């Protein structure tokens, strides 16, 4: 069983409040999507508007602190978080999608999975070289998708100012895989 760490030194009051909210609004689903996996279900958070608002507010603070001009959400649950953050900031939203889900010209990045590869895409004109982009997702686990997203955005000249996630699973190598990207988890498990 994993434990949830206490807030790290130097965290803001909003981050601490978000961590407290997350502790009470994440449900563990045993053996899903396969045996041996404990899935971190965020639907209790999504179904509680006040709690969701606290978490979105903390993510907005992360974006502001880093001077983000664009918010990029990683499919699929990253969209649920990135869209309200971008809206509150008046910032552009860039969806990072699975291959074949975006119409028109795209840029892509392929990355390794345990058994095979996967590809993510953005619209070819989604990001300009002068933009400061904050990546947003629900969980940092192995880091494959986040590393590919970082490479995709950096490859078009954008400055990726960080990766903000609800949860970092510290027992998995995600942080190492996305290094030197600044990882900002609201909660570390």
Curated annotation (Swiss-Prot):
Annotated GO biological process: adenine salvage; AMP salvage; purine ribonucleoside salvage
A GO CC term attached to the entry: cytoplasm
Main location: cytoplasm
Compartment(s): Cytoplasm
Broad enzyme group: transferase
A Pfam family that the UniProt record links to this protein: Pribosyltran
Family affiliation: Belongs to the purine/pyrimidine phosphoribosyltransferase family.
Protein name, entry field: Adenine phosphoribosyltransferase
Species in which this protein is naturally found: Frankia alni (strain DSM 45986 / CECT 9034 / ACN14a)
């Amino acid at each position: 069983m994993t434990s949830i760490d206490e807030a790290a030194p130097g965290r803001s009051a909003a981050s601490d409040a978000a961590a407290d909210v997350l502790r009470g609004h994440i449900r563990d689903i045993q053996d899903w999507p396969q045996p041996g996996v404990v899935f971190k279900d965020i639907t209790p958070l999504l179904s509680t508007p006040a709690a969701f608002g606290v978490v979105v507010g903390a993510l907005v603070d992360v974006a502001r602190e880093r001077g983000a001009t664009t918010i990029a959400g990683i499919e699929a649950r990253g969209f649920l978080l990135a869209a309200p953050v971008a809206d509150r900031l008046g910032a552009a939203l860039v969806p990072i999608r699975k291959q074949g889900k975006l119409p028109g010209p795209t840029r892509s990045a392929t990355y390794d999975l345990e058994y095979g590869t996967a590809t993510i895409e953005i619209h070819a004109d989604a990001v300009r070289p002068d933009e400061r982009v904050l990546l947003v997702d629900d969980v940092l686990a192995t880091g494959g998708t986040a590393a590919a997203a970082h490479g995709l955005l950096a490859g078009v000249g954008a400055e990726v100012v960080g990766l903000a996630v609800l949860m970092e699973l510290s027992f998995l190598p995600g942080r190492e895989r996305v290094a030197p990207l600044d990882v900002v988890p609201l909660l570390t498990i």
